[in-house]
Amino acid sequence: MSKIRIGIVGYGNLGRGVEAAIQQNPDMELVAVFTRRDPKTVAVKSNVKVLHVDDAQSYKDEIDVMILCGGSATDLPEQGPYFAQYFNTIDSFDTHARIPDYFDAVNAAAEQSGKVAIISVGWDPGLFSLNRLLGEVVLPVGNTYTFWGKGVSQGHSDAIRRIQGVKNAVQYTIPIDEAVNRVRSGENPELSTREKHARECFVVLEEGADPAKVEHEIKTMPNYFDEYDTTVHFISEEELKQNHSGMPHGGFVIRSGKSDEGHKQIIEFSLNLESNPMFTSSALVAYARAAYRLSQNGDKGAKTVFDIPFGLLSPKSPEDLRKELL
């Protein structure tokens, strides 16, 4: 059986993770890595070509699924619709407030090209989204709570790094214990965004940058920081590398509800990740398999995790899944 041919756009933490995840999936092979940098400066671990993104279009017949590994702030809003013109695509667009608009933009391109584009794959959005849905349908009377962390948010760190005057930055999302305990007890509290999480930022400034201006820009950034209590620490590059170079993350989705006669019922799904990008990458690769299969069946357009049957994610046959996992 021929392997699913994968291309990677962007070779940062996520791109490297996708490269590693492909090695764990024998039904797939990496064809090429596409970068905006000078390809000669990008060293990949696999024995594949590294090409400039401008050359990607010429590979439309050699790649079954293109996995887009750029950031959600500025990369994917352009790359998502662009690459869906030529390839089946997977991405991890994670700016929740903008997902409907992003979906529409990608869908327009994918419908026209006849390609399948699965957006916002990963763990949140992604696996957590599925568990929020599952909680709602199984316990229709109740409340859903999502807590993230403690961990490094790639999207938020990336957003800070794009601020003028910022050389490097890492952002931690921290669940507030009091809120978590109230939810787990079945209290069903009404919690504001600010009551559930805090955000802590460690920032290295460019020489001559104004700390007060940078801090204000961070704390007032819409969709990222404006609704949270945010603490900003300015530190040296050396301290950032020494103390904040890991990428742990995790969190949990809790559905707290009542069934007949007022019985308290709680569903909880949790993740504890040593490497956020490596885990997200594994999810992207699994959904690439589904995109390929949908495309083979003549499907097209943008999709989310809500539209993908779980069986399409697995390399196993439906018969094996029924026998082994059901």
Swiss-Prot record:
GO terms for molecular function: 4-hydroxy-tetrahydrodipicolinate reductase; diaminopimelate dehydrogenase activity. It comes from Ureibacillus thermosphaericus. Optimum pH is about 10.5. No activity is lost after 30 minutes incubation at pHs between 5.0 and 11.0. Gene3D superfamilies: Dihydrodipicolinate Reductase, domain 2 (3.30.360.10), NAD(P)-binding Rossmann-like Domain (3.40.50.720). It is an enzyme of class 1 (oxidoreductase). Probably plays a role in lysine biosynthesis. Optimum temperature is 65 degrees Celsius. Thermostable. No activity is lost after 30 minutes incubation at temperatures below 60 degrees Celsius, while half of the activity is lost after 30 minutes incubation at 65 degrees Celsius. NADP(+) binds at residues 11-14, 35-37, 69-72, 92-94, 121-125. The gene is ddh. Substrate binds at D94, D124, W148, Q154, G155, T173, R199, H249, N276. Its EC number is 1.4.1.16. It catalyses: meso-2,6-diaminopimelate + NADP(+) + H2O = (S)-2-amino-6-oxoheptanedioate + NH4(+) + NADPH + H(+). It comes from the Bacteria. Homodimer. Belongs to the diaminopimelate dehydrogenase family. It holds the Pfam family DAPDH_C. Keywords: Amino-acid biosynthesis, Diaminopimelate biosynthesis, Lysine biosynthesis, NADP, Oxidoreductase. GO terms for biological process: diaminopimelate biosynthetic process; lysine biosynthetic process via diaminopimelate. Pathway: Amino-acid biosynthesis; L-lysine biosynthesis via DAP pathway; DL-2,6-diaminopimelate from (S)-tetrahydrodipicolinate: step 1/1. The enzyme is completely inhibited by p-chloromercuribenzoate and HgCl(2) in vitro. Thioglycollate, L-cysteine and Cu(2+) also strongly inhibit the enzyme. This is Meso-diaminopimelate D-dehydrogenase. InterPro entries: DapB_N, Diaminopimelate_DH_Ddh, Meso-DAP_DH_C, NAD(P)-bd_dom_sf.
